[in-house]
Amino acid sequence: MSTKVPIYLKRGSRKGKKEKLRDLLSSDMISPPLGDFRHTIHIGSGGGDDMFGDISFLQGKFHLLPGTAVEEAEEDGSFDLPFQFTRTTTVCGRELPGGLSPLLKNAISLPVIGGPQALTLPTTQAPPKPPRLHLESPQPSPKSSPQEAGNVDIWRVPEAGLPHNGMSPEPEAEEPFLSHASSLLSLHVDLGPSILDDVLQIMDQDLGRVQIPT
């Protein structure tokens, strides 16, 4: 048989036939869920001065801890309770009592998932919006003066008899232009006499050719 096959699969039946994989495996070979793998308990070489977490598994047998600090703690009566839960550090940043080892000062217990000490991501603010491009020119308000509305120059037709730029206007050059453009409501259309006569002649010829049936 191949050497790549695991040892527990190298069993053969008495008849020399290979057994199927589902016949060899059973539910006992599958391990149950192991739960949380977080580092919640720590006991260092210093004994009582270098431990944190749930130490209830000791059941009051603190003399089994290494170091001489345990004997002093037993004399003070600090380990009288058989099931004691100690947590020397938290994530809240509280100050530790003096006399502890440097390992305990750096040790931080992980917070409970979903608890009040759970870490939260900082809220990010939305980036500011870019300034809008004003493609259209701003329209001046009706109450604004010409100086406030972009210094718009308004040209007016000089009245007759008044000097313009220190010079008197020429009446002969302005009279024919002003006579036709003085009123905006007046409309002068000159089609010429020949066009109207031609149109009337064509209409008369068409009417003469039409014969009324009797």
Swiss-Prot record:
Localization of this protein: Endomembrane system; Cytoplasm, Cytoskeleton
Protein name listed in UniProt: Cdc42 effector protein 2
SMART domains cross-referenced by the UniProt entry: PBD
Keywords, ordered alphabetically: Acetylation, Cell shape, Cytoplasm, Cytoskeleton, Membrane, Phosphoprotein
Matching Pfam families: BORG_CEP (PF14957), PBD (PF00786)
InterPro entries: Cdc42_effect-like, Cdc42_Effector_BORG/CEP, Cdc42_effector_prot_2, CRIB_dom
Organism encoding this protein: Rattus norvegicus (Rat)
Membrane topology, from the record: Peripheral membrane protein
